[in-house]
């Protein structure tokens, strides 16, 4: 096996190519960190229509131009292209799965970007992707020690390796990371036929009379992780946000842990950030004031440095606290604050937010899109960054905010339980404004505490300065993943887990 491991990282998103959630950030940063530790890491992801081949220097791999993929009774062709990701220290090979029908002709990742409706054939699209991933390895003659899969979009691979490729990949082990337990890949049971897997495996994917991608990954992966310790505990016991699938996860609790996400300190570095006109030099106050003014101009806000700006960059949905913001708006805007919100998502919630913005046109500013450069400007220009989530697997923006000098305001759930220390309770150790109940009054009280903190300039600046001293790099977490990889590789092969 040599000193380094051969690792294939499978993701439906990859920054800077295609990103809709934190998975895209993790898929960039974790493989880079593993590469820096001396491992042969490669990434594979789909080529969506919005991905520019010219910009990202994506090119064909001659022997991978036309791979036939059996989809039920028909065949579709996959062309595997190549690119790289880099942090200027190391480079990681990135394979790009191309197919005109499933990916290349569609601008969105999971949704139609114009309507925000989920593509009706997402099950078929990602069955194709899973098959193409494994076929790419066989065509390359490359057998990874570890295939690391992420969320439901790559959840079929652990079972496929055992059922369809038992000889080629008998030494390969699988690790599966749950980034969001609520999104499970739930489709009509008939979709299972497209996988080509044995009908005897259907029970491992069947849940509540539906084809559940995630259930199969839980049953067949050698090890399962999620993105924070507290979230791992929540989803084991929480029926509400697991669709009841926590009972299946409990069966694998001896091979299930939470590992904290890290920050890609190459992309999220205010001293070198390519998206910032005003980068951090020696004066943190100057950095914040210039970026705040830029943010005010971008969103057509009054150029008043004394009014606190609260930034939000949510996926607009019920998970991220959008409804709570709507319900609390009248009480929130009794305070002299400004909120800027950048995001995309549920159309009903977007319409409801527009009504609030119409009522408070000088206080709430909306931008409905995915915009990576603007997200960096919001972090740099905001005084506070709000994540009033109903549940939160991790919350990468908590760490981005601390690095960029915006004090987080969060609800005490999921990954925030591990990260957030309430300033109100501890001025010396506090790093965030924290509220407990997913209720209007608790949320409004948190806003009021934030405003009071902002008016105490000395304490506010002290907390901003202290927050920047945290080490959020991937190094420690990457080593934890390597330990898991080595652990599962030491274990003898089993035809099936005892629970399947």
PLM region spans:
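Catalytic cores of nucleotide-sugar-dependent glycosyltransferases that transfer UDP/GDP/TDP-activated
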Residues: 1-500
């Amino acid at each position: 096996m040599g000193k380094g491991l051969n690792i294939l990282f499978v993701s439906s998103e990859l920054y800077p190519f295609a990103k809709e959630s934190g998975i895209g950030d993790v898929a960039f940063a974790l493989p880079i960190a593993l590469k820096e530790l001396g491992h042969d890491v490669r990434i594979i992801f789909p080529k969506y229509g919005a991905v520019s081949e010219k910009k990202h220097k994506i090119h064909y791999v001659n022997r991978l131009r036309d791979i036939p993929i059996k989809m039920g009774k028909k065949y579709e062709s996959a062309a595997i292209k190549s690119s790289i990701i880099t942090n200027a220290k190391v480079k990681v090979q990135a394979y790009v799965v191309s197919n005109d029908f499933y990916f290349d002709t569609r601008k969105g990742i999971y949704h139609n970007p114009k309507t925000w409706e989920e593509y009706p054939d997402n099950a078929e699209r990602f069955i194709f992707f899973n098959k193409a991933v494994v076929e790419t390895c066989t065509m390359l003659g490359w057998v990874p020690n570890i295939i690391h899969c992420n969320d439901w979009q790559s959840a079929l691979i652990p079972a496929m390796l055992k059922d369809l490729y038992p000889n080629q990949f008998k030494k390969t082990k699988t690790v599966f990371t749950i980034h969001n337990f609520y999104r499970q890949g739930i489709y009509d049971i008939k979709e299972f036929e497209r996988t080509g897997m044995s009908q005897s495996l259907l029970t491992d994917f069947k849940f509540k009379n539906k084809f559940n991608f995630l259930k199969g990954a839980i049953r067949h992966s050698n090890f399962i992780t999620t993105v924070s310790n507290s979230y791992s505990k929540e989803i084991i016991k929480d029926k509400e946000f697991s669709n009841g699938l926590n009972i299946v996860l409990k069966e694998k609790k001896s091979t299930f842990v939470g590992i904290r996400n890290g920050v890609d300190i190459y992309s999220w570095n205010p001293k070198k950030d390519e998206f910032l006109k005003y980068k951090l030099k020696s004066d943190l106050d100057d950095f914040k004031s210039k970026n705040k003014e830029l943010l005010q101009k971008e969103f057509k806000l009054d150029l008043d440095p004394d009014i606190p700006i609260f930034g939000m960059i949510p996926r607009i949905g019920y998970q991220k606290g959008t409804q709570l913001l709507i319900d609390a708006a009248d009480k929130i805007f009794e305070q002299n604050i400004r909120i800027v919100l950048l995001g995309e998502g549920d159309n009903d919630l977007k319409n409801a937010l527009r009504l609030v913005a119409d009522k408070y046109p000088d206080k709430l500013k909306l931008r409905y899109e995915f915009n990576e450069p603007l997200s960096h400007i919001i972090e740099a220009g905001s005084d506070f960054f709000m994540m009033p989530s109903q549940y939160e697997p991790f919350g990468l923006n908590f760490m981005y905010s601390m690095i960029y000098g915006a004090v987080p305001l969060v609800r005490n759930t999921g990954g925030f339980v591990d990260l957030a220390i309430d300033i109100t309770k501890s001025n010396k150790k506090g790093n965030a404004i924290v509220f407990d109940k997913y209720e209007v009054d608790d949320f409004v009280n948190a806003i009021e505490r934030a405003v009071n903190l902002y008016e105490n300039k000395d304490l506010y600046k002290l907390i901003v300065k202290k927050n920047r001293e945290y080490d959020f790099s991937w190094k420690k977490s990457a080593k934890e993943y390597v330990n898991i990889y080595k652990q599962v590789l030491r274990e003898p092969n089993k035809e099936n887990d005892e629970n399947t």
